[in-house]
Amino acid sequence: MYGPFLLKEFLNDVPLKPMHNTRMMAEAKFDFEEKKTQKSAATIENHSNRSCRDWLADMGMVFSKSQLCTKFDNRFRDAKAAQTIVCFQHSVLCRFAPYMRYIEKKLNEVLPATFYIHSGKGLEELNKWVIESKFEGVCTESDYEAFDASQDQYIVAFELALMRYLGLPNDLIEDYKYIKTHLGSKLGNFAIMRFSGEASTFLFNTMANMLFTFLRYKLKGDERICFAGDDMCANRALFIKDTHEGFLKKLKLKAKVDRTNRPSFCGWSLSSDGIYKKPQLVFERLCIAKETANLANCIDNYAIEVSYAYKLGERIKERMSEEELEAFYNCVRVIIKHKHLLKSEIRSVYEEV
């Protein structure tokens, strides 16, 4: 009941083609196999226990992410709740991953130019799209509360309807439904939600985000909106509609709407001049890299992030506050002082007079 309704609403804005595309399916399988076999022998060996035949398909192993948290909003906090990852048996990932790539190809095939999905794309593509989209004045961002935990039975109904519409094998759809409704671990059974580690995590999160946007806002068709997982930013103020208010109240997914004249997306600030990274964050990461004697391994990545603001020249002064400019100048000083460590072509940007 809910699946076909949600699919219909999605197709109104993104008219997916239901016909099976043999070439796309072959490409999806090849891309998946190539990515898996490109991993180092050490990585494959470390993950060999995930190929154990005694590991049940509907059982996951729960791990806690141990990486440094570098989000801007989490600076100077004493502690933050750990993010969990659920690992699946290799056969489960190999079963679903090629078809998820196929769905992504079908989505990109018909995606209107007014929408942008930041998946498999470089920063130059994002920068070009943002400049074309003219992010000026009041823009709209959606910040979701507990996004992964809110991917409940209604979203699964949409995913199943989508897979049937695209003609995916029925046994695959039944397998997906079984795992979503029966998944457990040593801790016990899980509620229906999204888990980091699923083959479909980013794709289906992005599509759920798009679906919520289509249901929640009055769209005229000329808005430019970018999506990536639970991130969304539109180049104008979007107004809420109440057409589907009854259904939206059923969803666990709740959005905190922010209308701002300083829009951001995936950690990048957006403007009509292009994208640039919040400099305080980059400077603090550079300081951490210096403290941990890891600067040589990551300075190229930070230099690339800073380069988008650096290439704007004097125009960046109109975009940044005094605090941001100070952090930006500090970033540039650190990079130029250590530019002998740069190994990529980005070095030439900082050597130009």
Curated annotation (Swiss-Prot):
Residue ranges of domain RdRp catalytic in the record: 137-244
Family: Belongs to the potexviruses/carlaviruses RNA replication protein family.
The UniProt record lists the keyword Hydrolase: yes
Keyword line: ATP-binding, Helicase, Hydrolase, Multifunctional enzyme, Nucleotide-binding, Nucleotidyltransferase, RNA-directed RNA polymerase, Transferase, Viral RNA replication
InterPro entries: DNA/RNA_pol_sf, RNA-dep_RNA_pol_alsuvir, RNA-dir_pol_PSvirus
EC number(s) recorded for this UniProt protein: 2.7.7.48, 3.6.4.13
Name assigned to this protein: RNA replication protein
Pfam families, sorted: RdRP_2
